[in-house]
Amino acid sequence: MTFTWRRGAAYLLIRYERTVREALRNPIQVLSSLTEKSKNESYRFQRLYRNLYNPEFYWLAYKNIYANTGSMTAGADGTTIDGMSDERIQRIIESMRDKSYLPKPARREYIAKKNSNKKRPLVIQSGNDKLVQEVVKMILESIYEPVFKKTSHGFRPNKSCQTALYQIQKTFTGTNWFVEGYIHACLDSSNHHTII
């Protein structure tokens, strides 16, 4: 009787561990867990890098990128995210594991601005770099998005110039000073070494 109970308990433990591992592999659940933990100010994240070893993150990133109409533009190395496969993802993961992954140089194109004869720079990454960047973006957003101030509108999900203007319209109470200025090609002319 004891023998069968022990076998049953061992079986349940193995099944439980497998279920926990599978749940941890689900990127949506991992991201939700990171979001919940980020609400605790005293919590310190550790081993976030290991999420880059999870193939399911790359498939979710692929799904996010593929929905974008410009995602099939080839990078400087000629690759796109088209033709994604488990083998390609495993190669990326292995290069992450042995720390040999290096981003490829980006390709810079100049595209015309709407209703203007001026052009703006557009940086196009290689397919693998787009994928890795999307995975990192998902992880960082899940950690930092819950703790950002409601007044921050730049480069955030569901935030834009329009949401900033709407907030100003609803909450603006007046000011003593306005400063008007024009920053020409701000990001292009900034010293990136100083910023970083």
Language-model segments: residues:
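Non-catalytic terminal/accessory segments
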Residues: 1-196
